[in-house]
Structures are given as structure tokens and as C-alpha cells.
Regions:
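Bacterial N-terminal signal peptides that target proteins for export
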Residues: 2-13
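Bacterial N-terminal signal peptides
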Residues: 11-21
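Short intrinsically disordered, low-complexity segments
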Residues: 7, 20-26
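Hydrophobic small-molecule pocket/channel-lining residues, especially in calycin-type beta-barrels
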Residues: 2-3, 25-240
């Protein structure tokens, strides 16, 4: 299945990033430790805060979430656009049972995801983002804090949800991710959600990831899965 022109052009950019990362001097890059292929240690259907509690919602957030939970029980749920292969957005792509690849370049950092080959490029130039229209992947900008990659993303469309249970967000949500190596060669990502319209205060959750042996990021084409009678998103037990 061929990708859209946008996806094709973005792939070429990611190829360029990969070629730069493959340069003989790339192995000595101080931040190369976060590069490579990663897979989540778990695949939560519902996000909780770091202390294991439900995210603190406003009245509007509670209303939207209850509507999504009710819709999930219907014959044809509409709250989750990924069911018809539309982009699930971030941070949800990082909670799904698919590997993803991080490609590190001095000027940009690329993320390539296994589900329907979604990808994003993080601007490392230090310039602030200037969102034109809300997008599933938003407009990410990043910087290094020691070995940690810090990404701030805004311009995220409210058409996406934060997790499979239907946690909502608004177009004004700000997502901050702190990505850093931890013990045993793992990667930890700490997510901070700031969205006053939906959540009563900023809240954080975190995930850990490992290098899956012998696993590559391949294009799991969503429409092909549906044509075979399979769910749009693979079940976790089928991906471990």
C-alpha cells in the first residue's frame, strides 16, 4: 500500500537522518544512547498517574471521558479514530504494542513507529514551534539535558485520545516528554500532560522500554489488517 505524499516526503527525510546517523562518527555522538529500536515493557489500555491514580479531570474532561466510555460499549464505537486507521497521535503511539525507532541527528531527531508507519521529526534547532493547524503528531521541538532528550509538543488535534480507554484532551494540550537511559539498557519516558480545559492540574505518567532482540520496525498496514478481519491495532499478546 503506497503512502501519501506527506508520508513519502517525511520518509525521505527520515532516511536522510538515518544516513547521517550511520556516518562513522555517529557512534561517538554523546546522545546516541537513546537511538535504536525500542518496545514498551507493558501496553496499558488506561493511563494512570505516576502514583497510580486516575488523572485529575475537570468537569468537561469528566463529561468527555464518560461519553467515550459509553461509546466504547456501542456496536460501532466512534471515539477512537484508530479503529478506521486514522492517526492515533502522541503520546498514544508510544503505548501501543509495536516497536519504534529513534534516529538521532545533531539538528533533528526522528521517530519511526511500527503502526501504519507513522513518524515524526523533532526540531532540535532551538526555535519555538509555530503550529499552523492541529495535527495528530503536533509540532515537537526538543533539546538535550545531559543524556536526556526533552521534547515539548503542542498543536495536537483533539480528535485523538491519550489511551485506548478514551482519555480525552483539547487542542491546547501541551505534551512534555523526558526520554533518558536507565539501568539494564532500558529507556524511560516521563510524560507530562498540561491541559487546563480537560485536566484540573498537570499530571505525569511514565513508561520503560527495552531493545527487542531481532525485531525491526516494519510497516503494519492498518487497512490490510482490517481487510483480513483483524483489529486495527494488534493485541499485545500477538506482539511480544
Amino acid at each position: 500500500m503506497q503512502g501519501s505524499p506527506f508520508r513519502t516526503s517525511t520518509r525521505w527525510l527520515l532516511v536522510a537522518l538515518a544516513m547521517a546517523a550511520a556516518h562513522p562518527g555517529a557512534a561517538q555522538q554523546p546522545h546516541a544512547v537513546v537511538a535504536g529500536t525500542w518496545l514498551a515493557d507493558r501496553f496499558p489500555d488506561r493511563l494512570l498517574t505516576i502514583d497510580g491514580k486516575a488523572p485529575p479531570m475537570t468537569d468537561e474532561g469528566t463529561r468527555l471521558y464518560r461519553a467515550n466510555l459509553a461509546d466504547a460499549k456501542s456496536a460501532q464505537p466512534q471515539f477512537d479514530r484508530a479503529r478506521w486507521c486514522a492517526g492515533p497521535g502522541v503520546p498514544r503511539l508510544l503505548f501501543m504494542p509495536y516497536p519504534f525507532q529513534i534516529i538521532v541527528n545533531p539538528k533533528m531527531v526522528g521517530f519511526v513507529y511500527g503502526w501504519y508507519r507513522w513518524h515524526s521529526v523533532v526540531d532540535m534547532s532551538g526555535q519555538p514551534a509555530d503550529p499552523v493547524l492541529p495535527q495528530p503528531m503536533g509540532y515537537p521541538v526538543g533539546h538535550w539535558d545531559g543524556d536526556a532528550l526533552v521534547i515539548d509538543t503542542n498543536g495536537l488535534t483533539s480528535d485523538t485520545i491519550l489511551d485506548a480507554s478514551g482519555l480525552p484532551h483539547s487542542d491546547d494540550m501541551q505534551l512534555s516528554e523526558r526520554i533518558e537511559p536507565v539501568a539494564d539498557g532500558r529507556l524511560r519516558i516521563r510524560f507530562r500532560i498540561t491541559d487546563p480545559a480537560i485536566y484540573a492540574k498537570p499530571w505525569e505518567t511514565q513508561m520503560t522500554y527495552h531493545h527487542p532482540k531481532g525485531v525491526e520496525v516494519v510497516d503494519d498496514v492498518c487497512p490490510d489488517r482490517i481487510a483480513r478481519g483483524e483489529p486495527a491495532i494488534a493485541r499485545p499478546e500477538a506482539k511480544r
